[in-house]
Amino acid sequence: MKKFLYTALSLMIAFAGFISCSDDQTYAEQKDKERKAVDAFLKRDVTIVGPSGDTICNVGVINVITEQTFLDQDSTTNLENNEYVLFANNGIYMQIVRRGVGEKVAKGQTRQIACRFIEYNILGDSLQLRNDVSYWHTNPDIMAVTNTSGTFSGRFVTGDMAGSMYQTYGEEKVLEGWLAPLPYIRVGRQTTAEGEIAKVRLIVPHTAGQSNAASNVYPCFYEILYQECRD
């Protein structure tokens, strides 16, 4: 049943990508369309709903801050103002909902991190993928992340433990967008009622996204939980 669901979902995603590129647009035109879609998304007061009409995520109207403001605020985003920091070098927008418990991934470390997420296609205005509920996938997406002198890289676990990102897109390398929060969040496990794991929201352009987004030039919104895997 799961294999059928992922095959069907992969076909839907591929078809959506075909539709987005089927009018012979140039790459420059596609990028311009993506930029306009992101600009509109920031202002639209979006609420993401599921197939049954249930509310999954209230995105709201987004207030963009600079990296300098973000650093001046101790690398935090003000949730009351619904702030997202824009990283100028890669076009990723990030909101830190919770900084998490435990420790950051230190230089020289490789750690296993489990992720639960939703993926929303901004250009297609649709919920595209999720593993935050067991109906879609019982496994979280597990990535082995390495911090090499402050530069993060990662690979998704494959095989029987593969999560929905690898099963859907077939790409072992972790997308840049998912790695962007790691310098600023702690990765641990919840052991008390108050100590909740890290949670972020991201707007990821195609240049930092998964393979289908990169091929078809569309941005995605993510809400992701980061948790340290058990030994």
Could you describe each region identified by the protein language model?
Residues 1-9:
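Bacterial N-terminal signal peptides that target proteins for export
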Residues 5, 21-231:
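Cross-family detector of peptidyl-prolyl cis-trans isomerase
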Residues 16-20:
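C-terminal motif of bacterial Sec signal peptides marking the signal peptidase cleavage site
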